[in-house]
């Protein structure tokens, strides 16, 4: 039986429903929009598929687990209990970053430090090392703490998905490509009619509309 993953897709505020609609069109299951993010479930094969085809989401994060934590001890123990060795190899680099909102553990640098220590303890025990080399591939660890509920994730995207790679140079005050794609989606443009943006600036919205019309990732 194929393994099922929980994905967390960060989204710009106000376009979560648009991201959710796109995920449903891409065939993801149990799609649920929340403030600033959309949750869904899929298979390992969906990881590259989402990173290639998702137009409106910011990143594709793989959720490894969640728990309640009001103290640093609870944060440490909860993180150390997760099977990090299933995802991070012996030489993997695993920096930690994230945010905390409306929680007892409000210091982000302190949470980063505690989580790093928890991962080092778990991985060091599994691999039989006192000090992990961290000389290999990058495995960016992300955390969110919202009202004392901790979610730990791995970033599968690298650069944010708004960095499409089609610009030879940046223009002043650019519109993010993910937001432009969301605006085109909200306009219900499907590529069959003419598209006009009289105040197109650096052309982000028409470019995203053209990609949708051509069905290009």
Regions found by a protein language model. Name each.
Residues 140, 149-151, 192-195:
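Beta-sheet entry/capping signal
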Residues 99, 146-185:
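Class I S-adenosyl-L-methionine
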Residues 46, 102, 149, 158, ...:
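Short loop/turn segments at secondary-structure transitions that flank enzyme active sites
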Residues 110-112, 158, 210-214:
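Short, glycine/charged-enriched secondary-structure capping and boundary segments
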Residues 2-139:
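Non-catalytic nucleic-acid substrate-recognition regions in nucleic-acid-modifying enzymes
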Residues 35, 154-156, 199:
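Glycine-rich, histidine-containing beta strand-loop boundary motifs that form or position
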Residues 167, 175-217:
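Conserved S-adenosyl-L-methionine
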């Amino acid at each position: 039986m194929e393994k099922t993953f929980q994905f967390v897709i960060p989204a710009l505020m106000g376009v979560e429903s648009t991201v959710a609609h796109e995920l449903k069109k891409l065939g993801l299951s149990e799609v649920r929009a929340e403030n600033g993010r959309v949750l869904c479930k899929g298979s390992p094969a969906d990881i590259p598929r989402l990173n290639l085809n998702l137009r409106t989401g910011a990143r594709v994060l793989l959720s490894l687990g969640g728990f309640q934590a009001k103290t640093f001890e609870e944060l440490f123990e909860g993180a150390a209990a997760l099977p990090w060795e299933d995802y991070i190899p012996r030489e993997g680099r695993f920096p930690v970053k994230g945010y905390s909102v409306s929680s007892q553990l409000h210091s982000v640098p302190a949470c980063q430090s505690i989580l790093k220590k928890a991962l080092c303890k778990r991985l060091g025990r599994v691999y039989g090392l006192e000090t992990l080399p961290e000389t290999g591939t990058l495995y960016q660890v992300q955390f969110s703490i919202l009202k004392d509920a901790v979610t730990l994730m791995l970033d599968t995207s690298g650069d944010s998905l708004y960095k499409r790679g089609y610009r030879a140079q940046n223009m002043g005050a650019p519109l993010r490509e993910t937001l432009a794609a969301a605006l085109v989606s909200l306009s219900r443009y499907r590529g069959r009619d003419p598209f006009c943006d009289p105040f197109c600036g650096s052309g982000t919205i028409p470019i995203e509309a053209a990609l949708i019309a051509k069905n290009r990732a």
